[in-house]
A protein has these predicted regions:
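Phosphate-handling DNA/RNA-contact segment within nucleic-acid enzymes
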Residues: 1-94
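Replication-associated primase and helicase/ATPase modules
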Residues: 4-10, 46-48, 53-57, 68-69, ...
């Protein structure tokens, strides 16, 4: 999978830079079954982890960044707007409270998928937070929650800037 070094977004133009091993090896009758990125975190049965709601985002990068900044959720990713967002992959969310955090411009698409989750999850909602706070430019870029989290300087970044100004 190719990522832009400056933005952290996937490279999709001039072509999608994803290479599947089964395609390269030309495996006959291969049936791929995708899972949610971070799904293994759901098997942690500790009281702290089992009580946390699940947050689902599109990108694996976004799940990692959000997990660093926001510890209140178990962050999972579908691997794209459509990714593994299907009833089979969502079965692992049985009995969980789930909040979807779609990228800008994908909120309505993900809202349409709520009934699929409501049949499995204890509770399922779709956040429109980004749509409410985004500028038109941010919306046109299709930013995600990680992009917003990374816009703010962290305390460590501020400290480094102060050291650079006052050696």
């Amino acid at each position: 999978m190719g990522y832009d070094a400056e933005t952290g977004h996937r490279i999709k133009e001039p072509f999608n830079q994803v290479c599947w091993v089964h395609s390269v090896r030309k495996v006959q009758d291969f049936r791929m079954k995708q899972c949610l990125f971070g799904e293994h975190l759901l098997s942690d049965s500790s009281a702290v982890m089992s009580a946390k709601p699940v947050a689902i985002v599109e990108s694996e990068k976004t799940a990692l960044v959000a997990a660093h900044f926001i510890h209140d959720f178990i962050w999972l990713a579908t691997g794209g707007m459509h990714g593994c967002f299907n009833s089979e992959a969502m079965k692992v969310l049985d009995g969980r409270e789930v909040i979807l955090f779609p990228d800008l411009k994908a909120t309505e698409e993900w809202r349409r998928r709520l009934p699929m989750l409501e049949s499995v999850c204890r509770r399922a909602t779709c956040s429109d937070l980004l749509e409410r706070i985004a500028t038109n430019e941010q919306r046109s870029l299709g930013l995600d929650i990680a992009d917003f989290l990374l816009m703010e300087d962290t305390p460590q970044m501020i400290l480094q800037q102060m050291i650079a100004r006052n050696p």
